[in-house]
Every structure is written in C-alpha cells, then in structure tokens.
Amino acid sequence: MKEQIFDIIETISGTDEFREDLDMDLFEEGILDSMRAIMLIVELEGAFDISLPPSEMDREDWNTANKIAARVQEKTDEN
C-alpha cells in the first residue's frame, strides 16, 4: 500500500525527490502546494475507496510521505 501511495504522490508532484527522505516536509520543499494537496486527496480517495475530508486534515498532519501513508492506512482500517 505504501508504494502505491508514494507512486500517487510522485505522479501528482512530478518528482520522486521525497523518496530519499520519507519524512521530508513536502510543502516546505515545494513538492506539494494547496492545489496539489487537493489533487492528492482526490486520487487517494479514489484509489483506496476512503473519505479524506480536508476539514479533518491539518497541513502538519500531511506534510510528509510517511504521514500521508499512515493517514491513508488509518482510514482504510476504519472501512
């Protein structure tokens, strides 16, 4: 599952730079911005049949690839 999530992040961001450091702040490094974050949410919801309401997500909860993977795993476990 993690690899699929990382592939989606790579597709949305257009870079695999984050794979070198999965705890890299994706927003600070310019890998994600608000528009790409929304695109990422839409892709993750479709790929994993989960709901990720933006109102439930603080930027600090979604700023690294590891945190994104953990949140998606959490949501899939709820289903």
Swiss-Prot record:
GO terms for cellular component: cytoplasm. Coiled coil: none annotated. Pfam families: PP-binding. 4'-phosphopantetheine is transferred from CoA to a specific serine of apo-DCP. Pathway: Cell wall biogenesis; lipoteichoic acid biosynthesis. Keywords: Cell wall biogenesis/degradation, Cytoplasm, Phosphopantetheine, Phosphoprotein. The keyword Kinase does not apply. It is found in: Cytoplasm. Residues 1-76 form the Carrier domain. The modification O-(pantetheine 4'-phosphoryl)serine is found at S34. GO terms for biological process: cell wall organization; lipoteichoic acid biosynthetic process. GO terms for molecular function: D-alanyl carrier activity. It comes from the Bacteria. The keyword Lipid metabolism does not apply. Its main location: cytoplasm. Belongs to the DltC family. Carrier protein involved in the D-alanylation of lipoteichoic acid (LTA). The loading of thioester-linked D-alanine onto DltC is catalyzed by D-alanine--D-alanyl carrier protein ligase DltA. The DltC-carried D-alanyl group is further transferred to cell membrane phosphatidylglycerol (PG) by forming an ester bond, probably catalyzed by DltD. D-alanylation of LTA plays an important role in modulating the properties of the cell wall in Gram-positive bacteria, influencing the net charge of the cell wall. This is D-alanyl carrier protein. It comes from Lactococcus lactis subsp. cremoris (strain MG1363).
